[in-house]
Structures are given as structure tokens and as C-alpha cells.
Swiss-Prot record:
Pfam families: PDGF (PF00341), VEGF_C (PF14554). Gene3D superfamilies: Cystine-knot cytokines, Vascular endothelial growth factor, heparin-binding domain. Glycans are attached at N101. SMART domains: PDGF (SM00141). InterPro entries: Cystine-knot_cytokine, PD_growth_factor_CS, PDGF/VEGF_dom, PDGF/VEGF_growth_factor, VEGF_C, VEGF_C_sf. Residues 1-26 form the signal peptide. This is Vascular endothelial growth factor A. Residues 142-161 have a biased composition (Basic residues). It comes from Coturnix japonica. Residues 132-167 are annotated as: Disordered. GO terms for biological process: blood vessel maturation; cell differentiation; cell-cell signaling; induction of positive chemotaxis; positive regulation of angiogenesis; positive regulation of cell division; positive regulation of endothelial cell migration; positive regulation of endothelial cell proliferation. GO terms for cellular component: cell surface; extracellular region; extracellular space; membrane. The lineage of its organism: Eukaryota, Metazoa, Chordata, Craniata, Vertebrata. PROSITE patterns: PDGF_1 (PS00249), PDGF_2 (PS50278).
Length: 216
């Protein structure tokens, strides 16, 4: 019984869809009913009709429900009021500022398994406006951040104290690895200590900073 009711519901939905399609084909396009084949459309009318506004647009259901790939929808697209059109500046784009949801009955089919009429919600636009494009806005924000950063860096550089640089002569040209040099005083000291040399039964030569055999 339920199966029969589903098919009746399906048949009625298909009939209504076909009738509406025939009516839409027969009805003249908005503003085109009295137009002559070679008539030139005036600038003001072209401008008004092409400017940013809400207009009925056929939207693919999979565009709105990308995760429901296991289903087939009938119809596969739905008429929705969406923002479209041109703005007076290339840096602006037509975007929705007021939106609302509309519920539609859609035939939802799972091949070889089930089919039913489902209530599906879609977003419609009720008001549009020309706003700065995202990429332009991001570039402006980056520029302002860069400008602030540069100013701060300059201030830091100006306020930073640079101590005078000292250049010390090397303690030894050949045996640099044996010496440790203080960069501020340029004083040289031996890397190895006397106790280390004595542990090897040697003596520290403070001039060469090497562990040598004791003199007798």
C-alpha cells in the first residue's frame, strides 16, 4: 500500500513538473514580450538589468549537497533567487547581504534500493550589495600590516644601541685552537689548564699554551 502511494505521489510530482516546464517555455521572457527581432535595447535598461541584484538562477542540487553523492535527485537542479550582476568598480563584487532558507520537495532516489519525496532546504538571497572583493581586501590588509611592521622596525633600529666593534689580533697564527680570547679585552689565555697537563705528567707552557715535558 505504501509503495502504491509513493508511486502516486511520484506521478503527481512528475506531472506538475512537466506542466510547469511547458508553461515556462510558452511564457515570454521578462521584458522581451514586445521586443522586435532587430530592436536595440537602450543603455539605461541594459545597465539596470545587468547591475547587482537578485535573480532566479538554476542551481545544481549537488552544488548545495556535495556529500550526498549516493543519491540521484529529480529534478537535478532547483530555481533559487541568487545574487548576480555587475558592479561599477572592478574591485567590487555582487554579494548577498540578506538570506533566508526555502524548503522544496525533491525526489530522492537511491539506485536499486529506495526512492521517496524528501523535504530539502536551500538558501535564497533576498538582498544584494556591491562589496570589496576578498582578494583585494586581503591585499589591502597585508599592505597595512607591512607598513606598520616597517615603521616599528625602523623605530627599533633607531632606538637600538650599537656597541663599538673591537678587532682583536689573534693570539697565535698557527695554534689558534690552543688559546681562548676575551672579545672585550683581547686578553689571551690558555685553553688547557695546568692541572690537566699535570694529570698527563706534563707541564703547561703559558707562552705556547701547550703541555710539555718538564725540564730537568
Amino acid at each position: 500500500m505504501n509503495f502504491l502511494l509513493t508511486w502516486i505521489h511520484w506521478g503527481l510530482a512528475a506531472l506538475l513538473y512537466l506542466q510547469s516546464a511547458e508553461l515556462s517555455k510558452a511564457a515570454p521572457a521578462l521584458g522581451d514580450g514586445e521586443r522586435k527581432p532587430n530592436e536595440v535595447i537602450k543603455f539605461l535598461e541594459v545597465y539596470e538589468r545587468s547591475f547587482c541584484r537578485t535573480i532566479e538562477t538554476l542551481v545544481d542540487i549537488f552544488q548545495e549537497y556535495p556529500d550526498e553523492v549516493e543519491y540521484i535527485f529529480r529534478p537535478s537542479c532547483v530555481p533559487l533567487m541568487r545574487c548576480a550582476g555587475c558592479c561599477g568598480d572592478e574591485g567590487l563584487e555582487c554579494v548577498p547581504v540578506d538570506v533566508y532558507n526555502v524548503t522544496m520537495e525533491i525526489a530522492r532516489i537511491k539506485p536499486h534500493q529506495s526512492q521517496h519525496i524528501a523535504h530539502m532546504s536551500f538558501l535564497q538571497h533576498s538582498k544584494c550589495d556591491c562589496r570589496p572583493k576578498k582578494d583585494v581586501k586581503n591585499k589591502q590588509e597585508k599592505k597595512s600590516k607591512r607598513g606598520k611592521g616597517k615603521g616599528q622596525k625602523r623605530k627599533r633600529k633607531k632606538g637600538r644601541y650599537k656597541p663599538p666593534s673591537f678587532h682583536c689580533e689573534p693570539c697565535s697564527e698557527r695554534r689558534k685552537h690552543l688559546f681562548v680570547q676575551d672579545p672585550q679585552t683581547c686578553k689571551c689565555s690558555c685553553k688547557f689548564t695546568d692541572s690537566r697537563c699535570k694529570s698527563r705528567q706534563l707541564e703547561l707552557n703559558e707562552r705556547t699554551c701547550r703541555c710539555e715535558k718538564p725540564r730537568r
